[in-house]
Amino acid sequence: MLQPIGDRVIVKVKDEEEKTVGGIVLASNAKKKPTEGEVVAVGEGAYASNGEKIPMSVKKGDVVLYDRYSGTNVEYEGEKYLVLHEKDILAIAK
C-alpha cells in the first residue's frame, strides 16, 4: 500500500458518474471529475516553524470532500487514487 508523507492524504476516488439523473449516458470528456472519496492512508502530519508537529484532522476510513482540481491522480495496483495535501480537503462527510 502507498504511505503518504508529511501532511498528505491518499484518497480512493469515488467512481465518476456515467449517467445523468435523467439517464443520459455521458461521454468520457463530459464527466465531471469526482470530488468525494474515502481516505485510505494518512501521513504523519506537517511541522510548524517551531518544530512542533501539527496533528492531522482526518483519519483512515473518513469520507472527504475536496476541490475538483486539487491533488495528484495516481494509479497503483490497478486502483485510482488521489494524493492531496490536508489543506485541500474541504470537509469530512459524517
Curated annotation (Swiss-Prot):
Keywords: Chaperone, Cytoplasm. GO terms for cellular component: cytoplasm. InterPro entries: Chaperonin_GroES, Chaperonin_GroES_sf, Chaprnonin_Cpn10_CS, GroES-like_sf. Pfam families: Cpn10. SUPFAM superfamilies: GroES-like. It comes from the Bacteria. It is found in: Cytoplasm. One of its GO terms (molecular function) is protein folding chaperone. One of its GO terms (biological process) is chaperone cofactor-dependent protein refolding. Together with the chaperonin GroEL, plays an essential role in assisting protein folding. The GroEL-GroES system forms a nano-cage that allows encapsulation of the non-native substrate proteins and provides a physical environment optimized to promote and accelerate protein folding. GroES binds to the apical surface of the GroEL ring, thereby capping the opening of the GroEL channel. Heptamer of 7 subunits arranged in a ring. Interacts with the chaperonin GroEL. Belongs to the GroES chaperonin family. This is Co-chaperonin GroES. It comes from Lactobacillus helveticus (strain DPC 4571).
